[in-house]
Amino acid sequence: MQSESAPDDAGTPLVSCLCVTRGRPRLLARAVHCFRAQTWTPRELLIVYESDDAATREALAAWHDEDIRAIEVPAVPKRTLGALRNIAVAEARGHYVAQWDDDDWHAPQRLAAQVDAAQRAGAAACVLARWLFWDAQAGEAYVSARRAWEGSLVARRDAMPDYPDVTRGEDSEVVRSLAAQGLLAMLDEPTLYIYTVHAGNTWGRAHWEDKLRPHAQRLPADIEARVRLTVTG
């Protein structure tokens, strides 16, 4: 699953941000903006999409950043999300890989803070212990309960287990494996990541309403307004 890592001249490790996307060019553009705003260098963004996804291909044609690489995968046979994530890891050049979901917002300090947290803990990987939720339908913002939030994973590429060949829950298995090996650090900086709840989420709205929202805390109105502005621009 590994290719040769590429640190920069100063020896700072390259971080590969891995984005699997399909048919969401507006959200993808925000994910690209978040990548461009990162304070960590060197970094690269890998965007994995399927060959029948014309909307993503058209969006990619407008971006010419040297540190953004597009990986087009044949649409047939159909691959699971786990399989597509494995392709992204295999294509990554970084010493670290970071899950970079296209529908969420990533603070400019996210990569720097998580790599630093992993290194300080002597761990191979780091996830956030809490993050923020933005419910786009209701226009409400929350802070999550404390747990290992899989979507925020930043990990050494050589420590990454394969994602299971499933369409949902693939990142949970990877994080559980890293934790079981004692390789996982947790960072409690919820403002580094805003998870967007919307109609196209992998798990659907019922998962938010039944499993996540009951354990989350609604944010005060002034903070909620800042979250709204951050996510919607």
Predicted regions and their residues:
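N-proximal low-complexity "stem/linker" segments adjacent to membrane-targeting elements
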Residues: 1-37
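Cell-envelope/extracellular polymer assembly enzymes that use nucleotide-activated donors
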Residues: 13-16, 44, 173
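Acidic donor-binding segment of Leloir-type glycosyltransferases
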Residues: 32-76
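Glycine-rich, basic loop-to-helix element that forms the pyrophosphate-binding segment
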Residues: 75-92
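Short aromatic/hydrophobic "clamp" motif used to bind/position activated sugar donors
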Residues: 97
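Conserved donor NDP-sugar-binding/catalytic core segment of glycosyltransferases
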Residues: 109-140
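Acidic donor-binding loop at a coil-to-helix junction in glycosyltransferase catalytic cores
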Residues: 168-177
